[in-house]
């Protein structure tokens, strides 16, 4: 594929023109809060978490560089770029403090949320300015620095709160908080009881993110269990060491012992065994398994807008020309005409790798949310052309979609 000498963002069709946002002003230090600032929290998996999970929330809301970056990309992203960082007033401070307290109660797992708090939460999340949705997404993302594994009560509180916010995001076409909550859907989990029907074979796919690891652990546990039973069971132990006593008995006794051993052999082939550690830990149940029916996931406009924003933020975060010395030199290096041929090749390769990684993440998430294979393939084809991926990269992603669709 020939590399187009135009920015990626100008080719993406959002189907509706995003409203222009007024210039943003950095909030005073009164809005500064440790919970609003996120560190480089590691993702659960490179294949399950978008690489831009730290994009909008990697810095404090009042940080100058955050405000500058948001200002420069406000017309290139989507409508959710209306920031919660406007001039502080009593209403803004009250909203922010409420969302902080609300999220803390969700993750504490102790104090219950009363009906008044739930009603106020719904009111804030339905605001047209999107501040309530944005602050909720930020505070939820900040909690992952503490722990990604949550208790069962916290898990279902998150499911209910996510459902409210995602519905309002769909109604308002507010794709920013929805994109960040999409990442959180593959981050937070609780440990459920492993479901192991005795009649199903071990080879049946587990249908979860950790299916490959669990199948390997199950195989090892099965072999360990067989060895333990050989040592504990008297008859098996005699057979294991040569069956000396069996040879002294008559053919009838030997026949009875063979009949007893046959069902046991069949059982070891059909029952999935798990290690004691897995029994204690249980199976990871992620938020996305309970939020597949949210209408925003089935809107292609969301995926186009979210993908563009993810690629844009990843380039801005990783590019050595945008995170080093600012000023005229940066502007010159950003212009294609001022780049050497080697710099152009490196820039193209750099952008292709980012697009490839984000497409792998997004197509995985789309399939996990229940989108059909054709829709995912069409999305991949469109973005691969825009991102100038080569045939090998495109084939790898296509094969990944086929593999996940069959599973």
From Swiss-Prot:
InterPro entries registered for this protein in UniProt: KIAA0513, SBF1/SBF2
Pfam family, one: SBF2
Record's keyword terms, sorted: Phosphoprotein
Name this polypeptide is given: Uncharacterized protein KIAA0513
Native species: Mus musculus
Disordered: region residues: 1-90
Keyword Phosphoprotein applies: yes
Record-listed Phosphoserine modification sites: 275
Taxonomy of the source species: Eukaryota, Metazoa, Chordata, Craniata, Vertebrata
Biased composition (Acidic residues): 46-57
Keyword presence, Phosphoprotein: yes
Record's compositionally biased regions (Low complexity): 74-86
């Amino acid at each position: 594929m020939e590399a187009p000498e135009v920015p990626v963002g100008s080719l993406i069709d959002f189907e509706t023109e995003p409203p222009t946002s007024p210039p943003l002003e950095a909030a005073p230090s009164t809005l500064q809060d440790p919970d609003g600032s996120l560190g480089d929290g590691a993702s659960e998996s490179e294949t399950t978490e978008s690489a831009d999970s730290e994009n909008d929330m990697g810095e404090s809301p009042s940080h100058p560089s955050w405000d500058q970056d948001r200002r420069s990309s406000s017309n290139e992203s989507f409508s959710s770029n209306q920031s919660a960082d406007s001039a502080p007033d009593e209403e803004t401070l009250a909203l922010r403090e409420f969302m902080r307290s609300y999220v803390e109660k969700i993750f504490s797992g102790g104090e219950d949320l009363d009906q008044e708090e739930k009603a106020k939460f719904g009111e804030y999340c339905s605001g047209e300015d999107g501040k309530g949705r944005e602050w909720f997404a930020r505070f939820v993302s900040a909690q992952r620095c503490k722990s990604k594994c949550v208790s069962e009560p916290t898990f279902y509180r998150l499911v209910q709160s996510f459902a409210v916010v995602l519905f309002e995001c769909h109604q308002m076409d507010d794709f920013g908080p929805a994109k960040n909550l999409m990442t959180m859907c593959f981050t937070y989990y609780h440990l459920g009881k492993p479901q192991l029907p005795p009649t199903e074979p071990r080879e049946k796919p587990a249908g979860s993110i950790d299916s490959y690891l669990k199948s390997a652990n199950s195989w090892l546990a099965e072999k360990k269990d067989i060895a333990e039973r050989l040592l504990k069971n008297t008859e098996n132990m005699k057979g294991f060491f040569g069956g000396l006593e069996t040879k002294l008995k008559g053919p009838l006794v030997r026949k009875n012992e063979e009949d007893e051993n046959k069902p046991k052999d069949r059982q070891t082939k059909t029952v999935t065994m798990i290690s004691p550690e897995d029994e204690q830990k249980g199976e990871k149940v992620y938020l996305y398994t309970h939020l597949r029916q949210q209408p925003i996931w089935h809107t292609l406009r969301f995926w186009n807008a979210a993908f563009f924003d993810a690629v844009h933020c990843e380039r801005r975060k990783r590019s050595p020309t945008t995170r080093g010395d600012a000023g005229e030199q940066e502007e010159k290096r950003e212009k294609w005409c001022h780049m050497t041929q080697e710099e152009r090749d490196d820039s193209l390769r750099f952008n292709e790798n980012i697009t490839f990684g984000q497409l792998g993440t997004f197509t995985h998430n789309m399939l996990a949310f229940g989108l059909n294979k054709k829709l995912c393939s069409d999305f991949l084809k469109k973005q691969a052309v825009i991102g100038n991926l080569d045939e090998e990269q495109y084939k790898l992603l296509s094969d990944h979609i086929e593999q996940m669709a069959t599973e």
